[in-house]
């Protein structure tokens, strides 16, 4: 197939690239790959919607009919594992595809700080819709959750967990919450608003996440010796 555009990634950047291509070129084939099962959706909504009614289909960027009308061949649930610039091909879980122009729009993965036990099965990050479904499997209404990170994503996640019925503790290394977005005075107002709902500890250093097995409770241990038993840990450190 000649003069083919391939876009790897179907987030906001990938969709914007497809839209831009179609504004200047309505004829050449466009193939888009996503590893996710869903139609492309607004990723920021992952932490802005109640867990109990979570449904990524409510925030799709474009319908399947839009992709068809714009002749964009959307390959869902088909991760790309390799790119060969010399042969101008990409290899996915289902085959090898030739491209003339390639756009990589995969975004970044979550940062996991170098903490002992951070790779435990009881530690979660939120990057994809599937992550929320995985969380819901273990987060019963009476669960205890520790959120590592007091930025926007961490606090949004903490609030939704609390609304879901979980007991939530937020641990933040910085001296106050949301240091990249607001000053200490405004942060103090937010922390005051959370009092009685979510426990917040700032200026802390995490030593380890102790999680012997999925059948046992986890425990987040600070460098000063304090510990926080929990059923799950969510890392929201960027």
Locations of regions flagged by a protein language model:
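FAD-binding core/adjacent interface of flavoenzyme oxidoreductases
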Residues: 1-6, 60-146, 203-209, 219-237
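Hydrophobic alpha-helical segments typical of transmembrane helices
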Residues: 17, 45, 62-63, 76, ...
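Rossmann-like dinucleotide-binding cores of NAD(P)H-dependent redox enzymes
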Residues: 144, 153-208
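Glycine-rich Rossmann-fold phosphate-binding loop(s) that bind the pyrophosphate
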Residues: 9-13, 127, 148-151
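Short, glycine/charged-enriched secondary-structure capping and boundary segments
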Residues: 21-23, 45-48, 89-90, 116-120, ...
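Beta1-alpha1 glycine-rich phosphate/pyrophosphate-binding loop at the start
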Residues: 2-73, 160-182
């Amino acid at each position: 197939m000649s003069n083919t555009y391939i876009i790897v990634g179907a987030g906001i950047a990938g969709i914007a690239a497809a839209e831009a291509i179609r504004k200047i070129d309505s004829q050449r084939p466009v193939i888009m790959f996503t590893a996710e099962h869903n139609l492309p959706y607004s990723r920021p909504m992952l932490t802005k919607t109640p867990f109990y009614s979570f449904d990524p289909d409510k925030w799709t960027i474009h319908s399947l009919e839009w992709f068809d009308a714009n002749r964009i061949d959307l390959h869902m649930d088909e991760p790309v594992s390799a790119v060969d610039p010399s042969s101008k091909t990409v290899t996915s879980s289902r085959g090898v595809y030739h491209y003339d122009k390639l756009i990589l729009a995969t975004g970044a993965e979550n940062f996991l700080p170098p903490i002992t036990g951070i790779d435990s099965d009881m530690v979660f990050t939120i990057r994809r819709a599937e992550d929320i479904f995985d969380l819901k499997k273990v987060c019963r209404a009476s669960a205890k959750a520790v959120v590592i990170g007091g930025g926007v994503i961490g606090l949004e996640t903490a609030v939704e967990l609390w609304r879901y019925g979980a007991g939530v503790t937020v641990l933040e290394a910085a001296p106050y919450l949301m240091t990249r977005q607001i000053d200490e005075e405004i942060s103090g107002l937010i922390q005051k608003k959370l009092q009685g709902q979510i426990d917040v500890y700032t200026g802390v250093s995490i030593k380890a996440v102790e999680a012997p097995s999925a059948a046992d409770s986890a425990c987040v241990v600070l460098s000063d010796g304090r510990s926080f038993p929990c059923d799950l840990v969510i890392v929201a450190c960027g």
